[in-house]
């Protein structure tokens, strides 16, 4: 930690199904003293029912501490090739008939796409959907991405998505993050499922209703509106891997610090869903000494980068 945080949090979140798989190059049943600490390793969690969203989370030893020379590369290449071969044998489940995202639609008067990245639109993220030989990996470390590209394992038709660089933000939440008050005229709430079409219309990354309903969320609503017309003006979720995701503030309400308020609200009140499964190592009271949050932000998404600082 925190290099492997995405994989770690995804496993902590649970919501496993018969099609979930955990692949490891390390025999986790063998005693630690029987393993060579210098041998590279790779671990992956696979859930292909998540299509077209992230289906695979991985972590590898060389991501945390990359060796100075290239002597480790042949072993790493073999581990990656072996992992991909195993993943390729995991069949994706038939698409559910409800909560589809191929045509997410939009409420009247809304633009068709609101882009988190200036260079990628929703169609790019859906290109792989009809080809189950392609799986979407999430939060891939640059060292592992280089190996995947060198081995020719990245779909060339998905280059717009696959080669889009992201910056990883790690948030140390040990100092008791607290929620901050909103400006007058706004209140916190949760994202109501009836507003999922609105949420999905504001992001180019495909989202499924069946995923959103599982996730911790926070929304900001204006006060003084009738209950029949009430809809959020800002929202955010914690993803399956606890990353800050689908963060959005409507244009008319930007510049008020609402994005950071949403982030603090989620981190202060909803991270325990993941932390409750932390190993109980720490001080004499059994307190866990690890309290990290994280977010992946496209390098051309300047507004979200400001939120992470």
What do the PLM-derived regions correspond to, one by one?
Residues 1-4, 8, 173-209:
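Short amphipathic alpha-helix that is part of the acyltransferase structural core
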Residues 3-184:
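Acyl-donor-binding surface of acyltransferase catalytic domains
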Residues 68, 246-261, 273, 302:
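Conserved glycine-rich acetyl-CoA-binding loop
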Residues 84, 254, 263-271:
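A conserved short alpha-helix in the GNAT/GCN5 acetyltransferase fold that borders
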Residues 90-98, 120-125, 223-228, 269-288:
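Alpha-helix termini
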Residues 126-132, 186-188, 228-233, 267, ...:
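Glycine-rich, flexible loop segments associated with nucleotide phosphate handling
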Residues 142-156, 274-309:
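Conserved active-site alpha-helix within GNAT-family acetyltransferase domains
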Residues 205-252:
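A conserved beta-strand-loop-helix scaffold within acyl/acetyltransferase catalytic domains
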């Amino acid at each position: 930690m925190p290099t492997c945080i995405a994989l770690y949090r995804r496993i902590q979140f649970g919501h496993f199904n018969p099609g979930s798989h955990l692949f490891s190059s390390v025999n986790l049943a063998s005693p630690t003293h029987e393993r060579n600490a210098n041998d590279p390793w790779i671990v992956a969690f696979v859930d292909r029912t998540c299509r077209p969203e992230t289906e695979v989370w991985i972590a590898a030893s060389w991501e945390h501490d990359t060796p100075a020379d290239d002597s480790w590369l042949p072993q790493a290449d073999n581990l990656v090739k072996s992992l991909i071969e195993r993943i390729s044998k995991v069949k994706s489940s038939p698409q559910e008939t409800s909560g589809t995202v191929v045509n997410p639609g939009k409420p009247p008067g809304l633009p068709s796409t609101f882009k988190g990245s200036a260079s990628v639109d929703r169609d790019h993220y859906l290109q792989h959907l009809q080809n189950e030989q392609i799986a979407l990996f999430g939060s891939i470390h640059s060292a592992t991405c280089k190996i995947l590209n060198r081995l020719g394992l990245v779909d060339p038709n998905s280059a717009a998505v696959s080669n889009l660089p992201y910056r990883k933000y790690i948030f140390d939440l040990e100092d008791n993050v607290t929620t901050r008050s909103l400006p007058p005229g706004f209140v916190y709430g949760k994202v109501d499922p009836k507003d999922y079409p609105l949420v999905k219309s504001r992001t180019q990354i495909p989202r499924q209703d069946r995923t959103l309903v599982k996730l911790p969320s926070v929304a900001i609503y204006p006060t003084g509106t009738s209950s029949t017309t009430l809809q959020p003006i800002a929202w955010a979720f914690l993803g399956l891997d606890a990353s800050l995701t689908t963060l959005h503030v409507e244009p008319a309400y930007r510049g008020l610090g609402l994005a950071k308020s949403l982030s603090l609200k989620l981190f202060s009140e909803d991270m325990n869903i993941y932390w409750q499964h932390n190993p109980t190592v720490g001080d004499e009271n059994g307190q866990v000494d690890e309290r990290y949050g994280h977010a992946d932000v496209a390098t051309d998404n300047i507004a979200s980068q400001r939120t992470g600082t």
